């Protein structure tokens, strides 16, 4: 199982769908070479350099954590079941309530939609937060399958620099 990177007093907790097969195999988040997660964080000014997936644990040094709504690795999020999300939601809310980051950043609209049940979601900070005292921010997935440019992704993630 891919380890979470969690701690108390996090500025931002990045929450993905679930580990991809490659991430699970190598033991690091966002490990697919086409994934732009670490490049986006760097370009948005959230890290001072582009970290590698092997350095994912170092995000804790910046006050950032990593987890997923579902722990089970799959080829893609479309392989997840309703039961995966039901159980994942319970576990994720428990983690959030224990660690209480300032912001939950959902890496993909679908992650927030599955957690919240809210269908109409825009990028950025949300009017309704899932855990009192923790702001919810929805950002695009950084997967190489997402057609947004690095510049477009960066502009959205840059809003998190407030934290």
Which positions does each model-derived feature cover?
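Catalytic metal-binding/acid-base residues of hydrolase active sites
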Residues: 18-20, 47, 110-111, 143
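Short, surface-exposed acidic-centric catalytic microdomains
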Residues: 23-83
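Internal catalytic-core helix/loop-beta-alpha segment
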Residues: 61, 65-115
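Short, hydrophobic/glycine-enriched beta-strand segments
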Residues: 11-17
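A short, flexible beta-alpha/helix-coil linker loop
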Residues: 19-22, 72-74, 142-145
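Short hydrophobic segments within beta-strands
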Residues: 15, 106-107, 139
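C-terminal capping/extension of enzyme domains
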Residues: 3-11, 33, 40, 76-92, ...
């Amino acid at each position: 199982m891919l380890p979470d990177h969690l701690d108390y007093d996090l500025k931002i907790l990045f929450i993905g769908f679930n580990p991809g097969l490659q991430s699970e195999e190598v033991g690091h988040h966002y490990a697919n070479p086409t994934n732009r997660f670490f490049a986006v964080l760097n370009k948005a000014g959230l890290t001072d350099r582009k970290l590698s997936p092997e350095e994912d644990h170092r995000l804790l040094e910046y006050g950032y954590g990593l987890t997923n709504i579902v722990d089970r690795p799959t080829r893609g999020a479309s392989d997840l079941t309703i039961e995966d999300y039901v159980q994942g939601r319970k576990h994720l809310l428990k983690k959030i309530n224990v660690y209480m980051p300032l912001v939950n950043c959902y890496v993909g609209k679908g992650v927030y939609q599955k957690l919240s049940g809210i269908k109409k979601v825009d990028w950025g900070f949300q009017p309704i937060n899932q855990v009192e005292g923790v702001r919810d921010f929805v950002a695009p997935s950084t997967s190489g399958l997402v057609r947004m440019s690095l510049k477009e992704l960066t502009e959205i993630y840059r809003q998190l620099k407030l934290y």
